[in-house]
Curated annotation (Swiss-Prot):
Protein name listed in UniProt: Lipoyl synthase
Domain Radical SAM core: 93-312
MF annotations from Gene Ontology: 4 iron, 4 sulfur cluster binding; lipoate synthase activity; metal ion binding
Pathway: Protein modification; protein lipoylation via endogenous pathway; protein N(6)-(lipoyl)lysine from octanoyl-[acyl-carrier-protein]: step 2/2
Keyword terms of this UniProt record: 4Fe-4S, Cytoplasm, Iron, Iron-sulfur, Metal-binding, S-adenosyl-L-methionine, Transferase
Gene3D superfamilies in the cross-refs: Aldolase class I
Cofactor annotation remark: Binds 2 [4Fe-4S] clusters per subunit. One cluster is coordinated with 3 cysteines and an exchangeable S-adenosyl-L-methionine.
């Protein structure tokens, strides 16, 4: 198999924020270098890998993208498609679908792969659930994904706001199926509180991304814990056995094939039903570099392995993202 890879990356490990880091102001976005410079993991210069031929995005014609953006701005809503610089934004917006990001545009974490802004968030917008519900109804969406930034500043991690959004969507658009893509609710007692709250009005699909293999967590997801994320998925499934669970993993951050397979086995052992596997693409020069472009043949092999493990649906390909064609994935898991 042909592969494009860099063998290693030098890391400079520092403790806490940079000494020159200015105090964070509520609602002010730290992006790119400003964000990553606050991370406990700093990346030395690494060679930039040339994107292979299979990393291509089709940009549709027409006004659908601008029309959807206008509708979102009109209702003061945010999509992770825009905030995280998703490469599939034109395709999804062109088909009138979007993944809504609630609880603001500022994340309390500083993950090295993510283009969402870091900082000190503002309090949740009490009007957001109603605005979201009305927008979903106005757009006639049959399937929506609702995600959020990490909110380590909130006692429940934002779980009540998720439930308020689910409730508002179901009130305004009863036929819409709802998938939530949640943060990890990490913190003393926070997972238990979050799961208790989510039980008030569970989604149709519960998604939480594992993101990468455990050996890379310190570099890729500082502030997160691999086993904690697995436990969140398993505990939700134990409480709601009829609700499909889902997770996702990115490739190209330094993992090897056996580590990926082991992570897939861990997810199945924690009762995850659906999995997405896609290529990591570096958002800016300040973020974690791409260390390898996995081939389409690799993704097919992982898809086959996922089905061997018993996943009800496996979406595996270079441009696959967690909420990309989420409605199709959900149908594969029996959500109708």
């Amino acid at each position: 198999m042909t592969e494009t890879t860099a063998r290693s990356i030098p890391l400079q490990i520092v403790q806490g924020d940079s000494p020159s880091a200015a105090p964070l102001q509520a609602g002010v976005k730290q992006l790119g270098g400003d964000k990553i410079n606050r991370s406990p993991v700093q990346f030395a210069d690494a060679p930039v890998l040339r994107k292979p031929s299979w990393i291509r995005v089709r940009i549709p014609s027409g006004n659908a993208v601008q029309n959807l953006k206008a509708k979102l701005r009109e209702n003061r809503l945010v999509t992770v498609c825009e905030e995280a610089s998703c490469p599939n934004i034109h395709e999804c917006f062109g088909h009138g679908t979007a993944t809504f990001m609630i609880l603001g545009e500022v994340c309390t974490r500083r993950c090295s792969f993510c283009d969402v802004a870091h900082g000190r968030p503002k309090p949740p917008d009490a009007n957001e659930p109603a605005s979201l519900g009305q927008t979903v109804a106005d757009m006639g969406l049959k399937y929506v994904v609702v995600t959020s930034v990490d909110r380590d500043d909130l006692r429940d991690g934002g779980a009540q706001h998720f439930v308020d959004c689910i409730t508002a969507i179901r009130e305004k658009s009863p036929g819409t199926r709802i998938e939530v893509l949640t943060p990890d609710f990490r913190g003393k007692g926070r997972m238990e509180r979050a799961l208790e709250i989510l039980a008030q009005n569970p989604p149709d699909v519960f998604n939480h991304n594992i993101e990468t293999v455990p050996d890379l967590y310190r570099n890729v997801r500082p502030g997160a814990d691999y086993q904690w994320s697995l436990n969140l998925l398993k505990n939700f499934k134990a409480q709601h056995p009829d609700v499909p669970t889902k997770s996702g993993i990115m490739l190209g951050l330094g993992e090897d094939f056996e580590q990926i397979k082991a992570t897939l086995r861990d997810l199945r052992a924690h009762d995850v039903d659906m999995i997405t596997i896609g290529q990591y693409l570096q958002p800016t020069a300040h973020h974690h570099p791409v260390l390898k472009y996995w081939t389409p043949e690799d993704y097919k092999a992982l898809e086959d392995y996922g089905y061997e493990l018993g996943f009800s649906h496996v979406a595996s390909g270079p441009m696959v993202r967690s909420s990309y064609h989420a409605d199709v994935q959900a149908k594969g898991a029996g959500v109708s």
